[in-house]
């Protein structure tokens, strides 16, 4: 079964899809110094998107997604129930917290926005939301392909990625001292940091060759891995990304020697670009053309994987590899075939696209032009897909209920485990809750301890994402302190970092995907089973890790003070009302 690329649409700091491609072809950048952010950024020009917010109360984030989805839908008629919407984002409408952390706007909840969008466009299926740091967009393609491969009822998937600039994001990256004061220079000897951008991109994936754009390009392989090394820095060896690349190629049944082009994350930070060069060397791809788009449009976070894949698709269809803007002289320890000029080739028919992010996550996908047997894409019965397939529940665990405040309760739970792991005390509450639950369930399952770490996956979901850490970070940002924001807090403003902590402690290096939904529908367990059925894991830890919401309605100061001992604030009940339920599945 092949997943073909259908219509595509994007908007970046350079404009819409046509404008963006034309600018890149002509070596033009959309990055500029912004007085608002006191940083070099790439903002979407107002002319580049339809402002429908005034009509139906959509935010800029939601408007961009709606516009780009409309552009890729094959028909204006009703969307069939065989079409799924997958949204990737890191922070969604987090800008709504600015100077407003005493009230929690419902649109701060990622799935609330997703439902608004899906209902407005009349999708019949409930959307899927992925928040996996900077690999979110590439991860969304991996999830979409896996679901299309294992679920006969899904014929089409609209994959859309979007993130917009905000003080929240800019000050967070500034706290890590990772922003350049000039347009970024990926892979260059003089690179000194990244440039942030905003964007939205959408792609129609389809099993129907009649809906595929020509020449045909198929999403043939994909994989997600974890470094199990550090929550805010990449593996210094490049092994985590290498294994994502290797597994994506294996999934696509493509040899590394056949890859014609690699589009890397290429953020222009010292460690990221260094790590990527090592992963390229591990993969024996040092002579294959490589590029990064960050010098044109900036790092667009959860949108980057989708937007950059669309640019890869254009290059494949036109047999060109665009220049890496800002690159002059290679400054990576291992060889990379990077150029400051556009390069034409006879046939760019196989592309490997990668991404890496906080929490140690890595992802890669493989695109193939004019794949063999493209016109014989009938779905074949596969006994491994249907039924329960002897999938077993090896262990279950739920974090106990307690009337104690969470900080006291979780410390006692930690001490009962007789651990000596000082990192625990620096974690966010979300990370602590998942960490303790994971330690308990793994102790029930000795098989997982001795398993191949690359064959162990963690699939999680929740509603609030990382809202507590978001509020803490935003409150610091709102004060405009001379010392700036705290990197120790900002790093936890991504829900998948909680999974990353578990991966680091237990050396788990397989798939690590984090879904967002309004309540526990069993999505994480459903997807875990698909990974097992597709033979992409031997063991999967899956479940729900969330904090119950005391109120999603605005709360004034008197209401906050009235909550017991100030334990309820910002719309979130700070008592021990965590809901953490885990399972370990295996075949």
Description of each model-found segment:
Residues 134:
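Short, thiol/selenol-centered motifs that function as redox-active sites or metal-ligating centers
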Residues 1-127, 146, 166, 175-195, ...:
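Conserved "HGTGT" condensation-loop signature of ketosynthase/thiolase-family condensing enzymes
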Residues 147, 151-156, 161, 535-536:
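Phosphate-binding/catalytic loop of phosphoryl-transfer enzymes
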Residues 137:
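Short conserved active-site loop signatures built around small residues
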Residues 169:
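Short beta-loop-alpha junction of Rossmann-like oxidoreductase domains
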Residues 130, 155-161, 540-544:
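A short, small-residue-rich loop immediately preceding and capping a beta-strand
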Residues 140-141, 204:
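Active-site alpha-helical elements of protease catalytic centers
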